Amino acid sequence: MVLPDAVAGIEIKSDADTYVRLKRQVSDYNRYYDTNLVVVGSTHALHIADHVPAWWGILTAEKAGSTVDFYTLREPAPNPKVDIKRKLSILWRPELAHIQELNKMPKYREKSKAFVIDKILLKVPKETLTLQISEELFQRDYTSIEETITEYKKKKKHLCSYDL
């Protein structure tokens, strides 16, 4: 879930789910998200805290007639393991290019995505990046991304040919 100042991971475990994959999921979520939350059915409510770190929030969901009631068992806390470099890797190349533009950075068109991410990390404070990542994700348009990436690649190829 994208928030103005954070990206939150939400894992859902229904009453029919097991904990088999949860350890790997927790590890993955901890790398990318500023806060994490697990939503569980009532059968998991008593034991879920044994399976997620103390900074994870816990919500239970219970069917109540034709609706669902949610109860907060534990509020989420900031994730101490989030890796801003991994968080940046969620962004598509045109989104990274926009962050470079916002921060008046060189374009590095001929360089890899990893190179660009490293340069952004050197130049832009984490607090600024956190807000900019959220804004890029808010603006993301999944219906036009193929067109956006194709246009970005054409522009990159065209502009790089002038550098020769």
Where are these regions (language model features)?
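Catalytic cores of nucleic-acid endonucleases
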Residues: D17-E62
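Acidic, metal-dependent phosphodiester-chemistry machinery of nucleic-acid enzymes
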Residues: T130-L164
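A conserved mid-domain beta-alpha-beta active-site/ligand-binding segment of alpha/beta enzyme cores
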Residues: T67-F138
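Hydrophobic residues embedded in beta-strands of well-ordered beta-sheets
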Residues: V7-A8, S66-V68
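Conserved catalytic cores of phosphodiester-cleaving nucleases, focusing on short active-site segments
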Residues: M1-A16
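Positively charged, polar, low-complexity stretches
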Residues: M1, L59-A64, L73, Y152, ...
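Hydrophobic transmembrane alpha-helix bundles
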Residues: Y19-R31, P76-K87, Y142-K156
